[in-house]
Amino acid sequence: MMSSAVWQRSKAAAARARILGSRIGSIILILLWSSPGPALDCPAVSRTFNPANLALAAVTAFFLLFPLTLGKPGLPTHLKADEGAYYLAAQSLAFDRDLRVEPKDVDRAFQEFPFGPVNNMIVMTDDGWHTVYFAKPYIYSLLGAPFARLFGANGMLFFNMPMTMAMVWMGYLYLRRYNPPGLAALFSASFFLLSVGFSYVFWIQPEVFNMFSVAACLFFGLPRADETGLPDRRRELLLAFLSGAVLALAVYNKPMFAAVGLAPLYAHLRDRRWKTLGVWMLGAIVSMGAIAGIAVKLTGHPSAYLGVQRQGVTLCEPGKVPITPEIVKARMGGGGGGDEDGAKPSSVPNSTTGNTWTWLLRSVDVTPYEEAENIGYFLVGRHTGMLVYTPFAALALIFFLLRGRRRAGELWVLLGSVTVVGLYFLTFIAWNWQGGGGFVGNRYFITAIPAFLFLVQEIRPPRLLLAGYVVAGLFLAPLLFTPFGAPVPEPTLQAHVRGIPFRFLPLELSLRNVPGYERVSIDGLRIVGRKDVFAPQGAQMWVGGGTQVELYFIGEHPIPRAVFQVTNFAPGNHVEIRMGKAREVLDFGGEETRRVSLDPGEPFRVRRQKWATFYVYRMVVTSRTGSVKHWVRQYPPNNCPTFVQDDRTNENFFTGVALAYLGAGAQLDADLYEVQWGNTVAPPRVRAGEAFAVTTRLFNQSRFPWTADGAARVNLAYHWLDAGGKQIVEDGLRTPMPWPVPPGERVSVQQKVLAPPAPGSYILELDPVFETVAWFSQKNGGKTLRIPVEVLPGGSDAR
């Protein structure tokens, strides 16, 4: 009898183990073909075959194999954002079992990504750069290291894919408790695959890893309403331990996500399951302790990211660590700031808390207006809006409010927790809450998105799912079908927002690091436009032809009136300019210039920040056609001479019109042309075609200042006359005023002049010009300064 009882208990224990193995196995995607039991609400579901399981298994198989087929080197061509540190750390752990940055680690980067330097790889030291470590939180790299060893960079993407599909399965198993299996599978797959989160599968960064940690925490930790009576005690404790332990993985990367754990903790506290609560806490502590302990073993610190000296560096060539004590000493001493090849580590911007452990305790530096503005962007922003980039998370919230609001207090705690996490980002890093310069959607908050699925109980009415597919089709398709970036002019991670639907969403003007935009300052205004359709050229602003171009004018004062000089290049062009309530329509026959005056009325937006108030005006320029214009793109100095880079390249731009902002227009009618010439010195003889300088001194005898900036400014210029006084060169080189010249003041300028190409006797006629308006001589009766100059043949002695 005793042996029989023992056998029965062993059999029961084995059965419980099989059930637990089934749940855990679904997370790691060991797909079980045993038929599951039916959902509570669906007694008619077949016990022998479940099409939902087969569908998810097929989708899982496809996505699991896809990352392994990517050709290397080539797809993608380079490491972006923080990928360099995470991937090379995984390689170092896989092959060297350490996190030290050594020449062999640099070699590995160029084996798969040989087409350019690896930028902004974050490293750290605690001994003056004698020993260098990878400085990103290491746990993602550690767990992905076996896959990186087997498959290289593709292995890290493969590592991301099982976690993504595990989230789909967890969502399916959770939703099946309350819904038919087919509907549960459809919603879960749509939630995770039709989301910007799926784009991060193709990033060698921990976003998917963190999402998986949050999803697994809630899957294991929330009460299971499909179970009758009290669950098996040991099973309950094991699930609680796993819930706390797996959340620690995300918390190590981003501590604020510890708030997600409040939901299961509340449920255990409410039900007075003190032991379960304690085991949950124990799981979190043990997991975090193990993670920190391994970090100490590898780097000497609980975190390689905090409490250390941290730096961003560029990998320029194989076999060479780009930062050493000698390089740092040279930089600190002003000795060049780079190694012998010019590779200069770029400093990582520090917050007010630097790299210390107190970085979570920043001071609040945001006004209520900015907070409200950021909340709006957070929900529907063009680059970050949650409702746009994760449409099924929005549907999950709707289903929760419709069907789940009276059922479980822990779900309200969960909603409050993720809300607090979102508000933390918006409040304490109000200028960078989207995730820095390398992001799609909201990279920081994407970790919390799986929590929204666990708010759902009944998916009713199911027809609401169609809204999610409509939003995904309009806004996510361009992003999801180009996971490695789109081949577009002016390539950027944000290229997807150039589609028509995104025009109706607000641009996040509060964020500093949104790539893909030109930002120029003209006449006290900051003007922002997309790089592919906006090309500032000095005082002129070229806007793209055959399309609609959106520009933002941002200044500290309202703009009651805006005057523009509009230059058309294409014959038969039809141009419409809208700014606020003002609208101008221009029809051009050919190349010509016109002046338009716009009264925009109320600003598009008033941004009330802590230190200033900014007035924002939105302009939309639509050109029917355009003309190809040429310009020269200049590049910053090449810090990686191993890779050849041109200092400048010739570029093409399909230009609709060129705009020159002339201010409010009041100064355009100012009589500022009275001038008195001072002692001006010019060489009596110059060589043909030679550029030379004239020391020009003049007094402003008018009642108005001579402006030195903006399109309508005063420049020094000249004409060339022949010996008989006939003008042979009208528009000479421009020399800007060094500063605004008030009435009655004198200015002395080294004026640039270019000699005529042919030898002979000439007269240099100095004549200031009020740009876009008139030459001074046209308004003051011809008060120019004429200087005889002998132009000698090229190569002659011009002394």
Please provide the spans of the model-predicted regions.
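Transmembrane-helix motifs of polytopic, lipid-linked glycan transferases
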Residues: 155-180, 216-220
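Hydrophobic, aromatic-rich transmembrane alpha-helices
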Residues: 37, 168, 265-266, 387-411, ...
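Transmembrane-helix signature of polytopic, membrane-embedded enzymes
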Residues: 169-196, 211-212, 231-235
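Interfacial juxtamembrane loops and adjacent helix segments
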Residues: 95-140, 144-148, 309-370
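Specific aromatic-rich, kink-prone transmembrane helix
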Residues: 170-173, 209-230, 239-247, 264, ...
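Perimembrane helix-loop-helix junctions
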Residues: 223-230, 259-285, 289-293, 399-408
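Signature aromatic-anchored transmembrane alpha helix within multi-pass, membrane-resident enzymes
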Residues: 23, 29, 39, 52-60, ...
